Amino acid sequence: MCIRDRKVTYGPVRISSTAPETPMQSSVAAVSIEGVDRRTWKRMTMDATEVIIRSEGAFKMGKLEIRDIFLPDADWFGRFLSLVRRADDLSVETFEPQLEALILEAARPRKDAAGKQMMTRPLFGQLAIRDVDIIESPGRTNENLFHASDMQFDWLGLAPHHFKSSLTCDFSTMPFREMFAIPGKERITLKWQDDTLGKTGAAGKDLLRQTGRLSLEGLADLDYAYDFFSEDPSMMDAAVSDLSLDLHDHGLTAVLAYNIDPRPEAMEAMMPLLGASLSRDLGDPADAEAIQTFLARPGSLSIRSEDPTQLMPWIQFLDPAALGRMLAITATPGEKSLPEQMKALMAR
């Protein structure tokens, strides 16, 4: 089947479920596909997707766009179209498992004759999602719990694997205000950028090098870089090496301290006790002193692998003594002390 010069649009598509335990309505204004040539699609878009559950919550997505799609076989496209055409006549309970099975068939890793996982080319080149909203009560925009203006994933290559991801979103602090207070913050803006590149480590192991930045606006920025290793699909053998973390504090430590004890003088008195505890647990006085310096005057905290070639199993991150042996920690104090930052926080 070849419609390389055509754009095919289906919609609107509406699906509803009257099951008493989870009544649900969902709709997609339009699904468009263009540039189809058997196993390849140039572009697919879904416009104005909405799911309402029990008239109490809603998920809305302005647009989903996938480019340069490579399907598992030539028949997959026909099965997908058949399911879309029958969507209005199917219940959610029937439609969802069939759609999920088709997606998993396209996304699952292929294996060679030796049973090793392999792919001949990326499943898609780019996936972009715009204007995603999770709303507690449909129709009440002031109860928008989560809004993502932009999410994007670029699959740039297989030899080596290369991915780039980005996310810009904001979310309400309402769901956790009773457990965790952030004075002056009704919503938090989060930004994330990541670049993942396949490489071969010193021991000949296949690794993924991940670098990126995670930002909580007005709270903190985290720059990270590390090599990730895992051969087990369950990732129980997951390990990292050549770790680099740089935390730039813009108020996050003051918020955490406020939720432990809102009295600045109480937190100041707690610092010597914390320093003694850190020295004992980490087994490295220099690391403990760096953390205490950061907590006393939050500024920047840097963490590096002592030996960049040494793999650190994830389970060892739960062992303070192991962290003390494998990591080197340094700190640059901020301009204001923790009590001063807490007072400024409470003045908002």
Regions found by a protein language model. Name each.
Residues 4-348:
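Glycine-rich, small/hydroxylated-residue low-complexity segments
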